[in-house]
Regions:
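Long lumenal/extracellular ectodomains of secretory and single-pass membrane proteins
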Residues: 1-268, 278-448
Length: 448
């Protein structure tokens, strides 16, 4: 180990060698640890006020072109002093109240800006303004007082024409489904499909979407959104409409017991692993699972390990489900006793010359003792044989800071649940190059 590695070494919950950080670059560390810092905001590293750090903060917050981490993004944008208009561009209007305090000049400037936007008819500003009926009652009173309005005047001024308001006002005929934002469409799909006033129109709309006659907005829909709501929506339709990226990779999903946590790490791993398997050019529809015994899973293929009776019952139940649900169910192995990543690496070391470009490891990184040694041996074997295969460490751990290796082999570090970011990978990239390209592409996307 290097001197830096020695002083940053630690053990996983299961006794394997790991580290406290991935790199000396704080942005790369945050990129890998967003799940943890989202739950531990008081531990977020301080970032100095610079253009690159401001752009990174916006990227972390942005649900359309970035990672969509609201609380962490707010903290970073406040820390790096992102401008008001850029704060709103990356997130929501109420993000500005996270950093501004009443009775200050900057707070007054924010309210003047928001007032002018509402006068212009900005519906999104209206939607995210604090309301008397919410937990932000005191803030709403402060704003109304500054604008010289009483409760009724303020409520009328910020009343918006969103899907939520149309539903609450029973203006069902005003809802144009092709204009409903992506997350609202998922949130209210059950209501649309069951309310007598909308059911017939909604089902006709879905048929039109399938026929290519109408659009379904999915700009901020993630694979995890589809996974969470797979029993409430037409998961096959939503999955078919999200952007697909292709890559030479093998998704490797951790199915150990520690993944079944309050952060739903297992659910996120399944959602991302399923997406990557569908998009893999190396082994389409294949996923490697690992716990005590690695398994190669074919999406949608029933698991027969529990005997004839279970197989027959599972097959009958599968007929009632969508293709998406069947493929997700096929990833449940029942093996959750260990986190033996070393067993996976030992098996993969026997691959012939036809190698994938990436091994995408979806895990909380709490590997069993000895896994690091097996990984080191396999990476050394890859290098000796001239293989350029790299590991994408996809961290889902919200409990601990656990890094499987420091930036030694040029591997990639990422977290969250947006696999679309992998489209910015390129041959020869290491973690730093990937991060830099993410920020370059994000700047283009938002017009910076």
């Amino acid at each position: 180990m290097t001197l830096n590695e020695i002083f940053n070494a630690k053990l996983t919950e299961n006794g394997d060698l790991s580290f406290k950080k991935a790199s000396d670059n704080p942005l790369l560390n945050i990129l890998f640890l967003t799940e943890y810092y989202q739950k531990h905001l008081d531990e977020v590293p301080l970032l100095e006020d610079s253009d690159i750090n401001r752009l990174f903060a916006m990227f972390i917050r942005d649900p359309r072109y970035g990672m969509g981490r609201r609380d962490l993004g707010r903290r970073l944008m406040s820390m790096t002093d992102v401008a008001i208009d850029d704060t709103i561009k990356a997130g929501r209007v109420d993000d500005v109240f996270y950093r501004e305090y009443p009775d200050t000049y900057s707070f007054a400037c924010v309210l003047d800006y928001l007032h002018s936007e509402i006068v212009k008819g900005n519906e999104l500003v209206k939607k995210w303004m604090p309301r008397y009926s919410s937990k932000n009652l005191l803030l709403a009173r402060t704003i109304a007082k500054y604008w010289g309005m009483n409760k009724q005047q303020y409520g009328h001024f910020i009343k918006c024409n969103t899907t939520e308001n149309k539903l609450s006002d029973h203006r069902f005929d005003d809802i144009q489904f092709e204009h409903v934002p992506s997350l609202a469409m998922i949130k209210y799909a059950h209501a649309f499909s069951t309310k007598p006033e909308t059911k017939e129109r909604y089902l006709k709309y879905l048929e039109d979407v399938k026929a290519g006659k109408k659009d379904l907005k999915v700009s901020t829909t993630t694979v995890y959104d589809i996974y969470k709501n797979r029993d409430k929506i037409d998961a096959d339709l939503f999955f078919s409409k999200i952007e697909k990226i292709s890559g030479s990779w093998i998704p490797i999903v951790d199915t150990s017991g520690s993944m079944c946590d309050s952060n739903d790490s297992f659910g996120k791993a399944l959602a991302i692993g399923h997406y990557l398997a569908k998009c893999s050019t190396y082994c389409p529809n294949k996923v490697v699972s690992f716990s005590s015994h690695p398994q190669l899973i074919t999406l949608g293929q029933p698991v027969q390990r529990r005997g004839y009776w279970y197989y027959q019952q599972a097959s009958k139940e599968a007929l009632k489900k969508s293709q998406y649900q069947r493929e997700i169910d096929s990833m449940y192995t029942g093996d959750c006793s260990n986190t033996d990543f070393g067993a996976v690496m030992r098996l993969l070391s026997h691959l012939d010359g036809n190698m994938p470009e990436y091994l995408v490891v979806l895990s909380d990184m709490e590997f069993d003792s000895g896994s690091n040694t097996s990984k080191e041996e396999t990476m050394r074997l890859f290098k000796e044989n001239g293989y350029n295969t790299k590991i994408i460490w996809w961290n889902l751990n919200s409990r601990n800071i656990t890094v499987p290796e420091m930036d030694h082999y040029g591997n990639i570090y990422i977290s969250g649940y947006n696999p679309m970011l992998l489209k910015y990978l390129a041959a020869g990239f290491d973690g730093e190059a990937f991060l830099n390209n993410l920020l370059r592409e994000y700047a283009k996307a938002i017009g910076e």
